[in-house]
């Protein structure tokens, strides 16, 4: 169980990296761009991201924060300065039937403050990305109010950690319900009812099949909500035919002047998919090979796609959240790929130039073993 270290110095520290510049000596410099990943750790065994026990076992945010403390150790050891926390970090925090869980955030105020202090000290950018069940544009007012309650809880945790405005809660626009324009209007209407604490944290992302980059830009124009550009989603769903470069820069321009924007990057899966098909008469299952679906995320990031994007955005300052299936392993591999194939891009992320081309056979073996171990754990949990 995580116990925060006591400190005699109660002076509040400044928010995390609100500005985009750092001062070293008398010289103003730009902080390196950051690479991040989401939730699960695959590079080290037994690092849980949240307390996933069922309600009868009394799960608690305090247990999740203990896991998060260990994750912070791993991030620091690998010089990773951006991380998306599990949106289930506070179990049942807003569940209407389990009011005994509703006070977890207040109960963990000291632990949250301590972890926030550590994040600020390490310049670690944190965020949440709630599930697809957070729908602000639903015609059902009950679902909208539940979504708002969940957003309020996640915003409160970031506030209790005393993090700056770079720590955000990322959402999608929601369902279309047969009319994209009306869906946008409902989202705008709901946004205007949100508390300032939620608005300060909330950012909106374009998606891969419903709300395009053009759609969320319209929502931004009406609300001022900052936008996250998702590269793979843009490639999969851009019916208006927007150009990539100008669109990304519009998204970045939607952020407040002193808050660094961030984007999402992933590569599409290209391999065949194995699907089980059950015969209705015999009830026997057979494996069927199907072509890939381009909205699916690959295990790793294609380095040359990433390099091309970064060169197209030369001079822009932003952080990149990687949404590859291999999580931290994909981030560490992309770093090495940048150093090898695009040293000028690697420098933007603060990575040193390679003096020689390394033999990667040992590293690849370690990655394969980690992925196999993760697959085995997943299989046991499913069983």
Regions found by a protein language model. Name each.
Residues 217-221, 229-239:
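Long, repeat-rich segments with strong aromatic
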